[in-house]
Structures are given as structure tokens and as C-alpha cells.
Amino acid sequence: NPDLVITTGGLGPTEDDITREVIFDFVGTGYKFDEDYWKNLKRRFKRFGFDIPESNRSQALIPTQGKVIPNSVGSARGLQFQIDSTTLITLPGVPAEMKSMMHESIIPYIRAQGVSTPNMKLLRTTGIPESTLIEKIEPATAKEHHCTIGYYPSYYGVDIRITSDAQATLSRLSSEISDILGHSIYAVDKIDIAEVAVGLAVDKGATFAAAESCTGGLIGHRITEVSGSSNAFLGGVVAYSNDVKQKGLGVQSSTLEKYGAVSAETAEEMAENVLSKFQADYGLSVTGIAGPTGGTEDKPVGIVYIGLAKKGTVRVKKLQFGEHRSRNKLRTSQAALNMLRLALIHE
């Protein structure tokens, strides 16, 4: 028999949320109504300007045997039962709620049982394809190292997860991989590249601003998700149309007519002008064709130009992504933030 069983989902207030009743029946426990929790739920709904529906009463039911697991994010509490040698835990299916409860209650419970967990290190990389990355670090991974290595690609890059029972072995291998990949690794542990870029800027006392076209404000959004970003990020302009590129950023009409909105020349002017407009130390710009329409033979869908200006200098990087609009926006924002990060490292 397993030591631990965890289920997720079905603890909501709707008719198809039947997990609570099924679990009560399976365990053979009675239940009662938690009046205090019901009052708490009503207060929480009232704070947001709503009257609580009667259907939510089911979320105030608690077993006469077993434990209730608190939920600091939502209204559905979890449940925990002991069935002979097996612990049964059921959690909400909403990812944000489930993750929060795992971190706040379940993982501490598991650790308290004396369960040993392997040592782990996460190396986050960007700007290097998975196959190229694996080939590049082969001199380190081909040797006997007694570690488990996992590769997790995303639109932002590739995460390398290294685990080992021995901390010294883990440290040695991760150090070798870090030496090989250098600045392709932007973070150790699960940190967003925006947080890294903001941290570098704050440490160096630098400020930056962004001029966005094809990303539609995504870069600014990612930056402002970082607490304290106002110490480095001055602001931005979403210049989606040519008219706004001219009036809002001062891109020359002759540049747009001769080279087009998606061009190195336009990206260059956008970066220089947003730098000047906000009196920043760095000006970041992106312009491209996110897709799936709008591409031409000369400028296919997925083409992107990223500009980075610093007083007296400006450089532009051309990238080619695929045909999926949302993915292109994510990848462009990541590449732009990485360009800023590298510039700050080498300042």
C-alpha cells in the first residue's frame, strides 16, 4: 500500500464538484457544518461586493474524522485522512490554490515524516536551443557523475534540473555546467529573467525604459511584476501603429517609408528615442511580425528586431521565430530582457 495518496479537484461549490462527498463516503466518516468558516466565507465575498451563493455552503462541510487543510488563496479547503498506513490528502484543482497549499501545508507535512529529499539545483538558460545546449555540456555530463539531469524546454529557454543524494557531487557537476554555459545561464533557482534584469539595474544604479510594438506591453508587464522595479524601470511606450511610432516616439516618417515599421532602422530609432524621452540609461525596443498574418517573402512571420540604446551607442539584433503569435510575443520579450541583462552584466 502507498504511504501517501494525493488527489486534486472537485472541491468547488458546483454540482459536478463531488470529490468531498465521495471521499467522506469512501473513508466512512460523517460530517458537520462549520458555522465559523461559513461566516468567514461570507465576509470574504462581501469584501469584494458580492453576496455568497448558497451553493458555497458545501465548502463549509468538515469531516467528523480527519483534518481540514487551510487554503489561504481560495475558498475550498483541503482534507486529510489516515486509512491504516496510508495518508489520503485531497486538494482543490485550481493550480494557484493547489500550489499554495502544497508549499504551505503538504510539503512541510511530508518533511515532518522524515522523508529525505534529494539535493537539487535548477539552472535556467535562455538563447540556446535544447539540442545545442545538451551537446555543449556533454564534456561535463558524459563523465560518471552520479546525478540525475532533466531538461525542461519552454518558450523562455531551457531549465536544467540536476539532482543527487550527495551535495558535493551536485555542486561539482553544476559548477562544471555553469563554467561551460557562462552567461547563457541567467538564474539559479526558479527566478524570472525580468527579476534578474531589474536586480542588475538596481545594483548598478541604472535606469531603463521600453518601446514596444509587437509585444504590446508584455515587456513592461513582466518588469512590473517584479517588486521594486520602479527603482530601475522608468516607463514605456506601446507604439503599435506607425502614427504612434512617429508622434509618441519620434520615429522619422522617412525611416518608416523607406525601411518599414519592422526593420533594424526603426528598432534603432525606437530605442534611441525612448532613451531620450525618459532620460534613462538604457532604451529597449522591439518591433516585429507576431503573426500568423502580415508576413512577406522579405519579412516573414516571426521576424523580430530588438534594439538597445545607451547614451552614444545603439545596437539592433535580428531574430526569427515561428508562426504562433502568443509564442512569438513571449520569446521576443524574453530575448529583449536577456539583451538588457547581458548589457548590464558587461557594463
Q: What does each model-identified segment do?
A:
Residues D3-L4, Y282:
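Short, Asp-centered acidic motifs that coordinate Mg2+ and/or phosphate
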Residues T7-E15, P92, S164-D165, V286-I289:
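Glycine-rich beta-strand-to-loop/alpha-helix junction loops that act as flexible
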Residues T7-F33, I177, L181-K190:
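Flexible gly/pro-rich beta->alpha loop and the following alpha-helix that scaffold active-site loops
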Residues D16, K39-R44, F48, S58, ...:
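Conserved N-terminal alpha-helical segment that immediately precedes and caps sugar-phosphate-binding
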Residues D17-Q113:
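Proline/glycine-rich low-complexity loops and linkers
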Residues Q80-F81, Y151, Y305-K310:
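Short beta-strand elements
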Residues Q82-Y156, T163-L170:
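Accessory alpha-helical/coil subdomains and C-terminal extensions
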Residues A168-E347:
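Short alpha-helical segments enriched in small residues
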